[in-house]
Regions:
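Conserved hydrolase catalytic core segment
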Residues: 98-143
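Catalytic histidine-centered segment of alpha/beta-hydrolase-like enzymes
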Residues: 271-284
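Conserved serine/cysteine hydrolase catalytic core
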Residues: 189, 198-259
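Active-site loop/oxyanion-hole signature of alpha/beta-hydrolase fold enzymes
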Residues: 11, 59-103, 142-144, 285
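Conserved HGGG/HGGXW glycine-rich cap/lid loop of the alpha/beta-hydrolase fold
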Residues: 17-69
Length: 309
């Protein structure tokens, strides 16, 4: 089934674009990683479409959604409000009581969890796929009293800001990127989807990233503005928390969040940060296994150890 593109208006004046795979099944709402777009989640969406009506949004500043000026147009709370507006519109048009599955990759996982914390019961269950969880001040002090732990976000933001936004063609971007470690880890079709939908055509014949470098950098720099540790106790839905075994995010922060979430199951598969683009089959396997667990049976926050998949 080919998805159709839709647009949802928010009370903040944003228009959020989305890819809708259609059908009358329970809804799975997907949120991509920073710098990506909803179309890049197609490999996961297509595999889930037998069980769910899958809708993958473009966050503001990404894909074909509204792109206000940075940095002021990108408060982290705005991403949560945008996603909630789309979820509520879908519930209104279908008559469903809850979104069956909220699935977020990287920063999308934080956005999904914060939306559930704000509006308890919005989701039947959620999945956070290697979300950017960094130690807060208290955890950082406990892990390293000497103060040697350095927050990587300013450096990552600076790197994103230097990214080349305009290219002669998609072919030139492909040639420059295809051997870089991040893109080599992706499934070939995921890379092609990013080239196709992550760029827009310009009138001068060149192509330009839809997610501007200053937008991506703003999100990296301010991703800690959403206090997921404080919000965790308000997340009533069962949570699948996935830490990428080959990722670079601190395991201690994941373990801390696991303890704080009321109903959390954690998995540590041997895969890199962008699971849906690198390992869509494994990603769907993890999602389906968690979906098969009765909603009330997710591991309690104080019980069980992280396991591998």
């Amino acid at each position: 089934m080919q998805p159709r593109q839709r647009r949802f208006a928010t009370t903040a004046g944003m228009e959020i674009a989305a890819w809708d795979w259609g059908g009358d099944r329970p809804i799975a709402l997907l949120q991509h990683a920073n710098g990506m777009c909803g179309a890049t989640l197609a490999l996961v969406a297509e595999r889930l479409a037998s069980w769910y009506r899958v809708v993958a949004i473009d966050a503001r500043g990404h894909g074909d959604s509204s792109a206000p000026p940075a940095p002021d147009g990108y408060p982290m709370r705005g991403f949560v409000d945008d996603l909630t507006a789309v979820a509520e519109a879908l519930l209104s048009e279908t008559g469903h009581a809850r979104i069956a599955y909220g699935i977020g990759s990287s920063f999308g996982g934080i956005v999904i969890a914060m939306a559930e914390a704000d509006r308890s019961g919005l989701f039947e269950r959620i999945a956070m796929l290697d979300p950017p969880i960094h130690p807060d001040d208290a955890l950082r002090a406990r892990l390293d009293p000497s103060g040697g732990i350095v927050d990587p976000r300013p450096l990552i933001a600076a790197q994103a800001r230097r990214r080349n936004a305009v290219w002669p063609s998609r072919d030139s971007a492909r040639a420059a990127w295809q051997d870089k470690p991040m893109f080599k880890a992706w499934q070939p079709r995921a890379f092609e989807l990013y080239l196709a939908e992550g760029f827009r055509d310009r009138s001068d014949g060149q192509v330009e990233l839809k997610c501007r470098p200053d937008v991506e950098a703003t999100i990296f720099a301010t991703s800690g503005d959403l206090d997921i540790f404080a919000a965790a106790k308000h997340v009533s839905a069962p949570v699948l928390l996935v830490r990428a075994g080959r990722g670079t995010l601190p395991p201690e922060a994941f373990e801390h969040l696991r303890r704080l979430l009321p109903r959390c199951t954690m998995r540590v598969p041997d895969v890199g940060h962008l699971l849906p683009l690198e390992a869509p089959d494994l990603t769907v396997q993890l999602l389906r296994e968690f979906a098969a667990t009765p909603a009330g049976d997710a591991a309690p926050a104080d019980g069980g150890r992280a396991s591998s998949a």
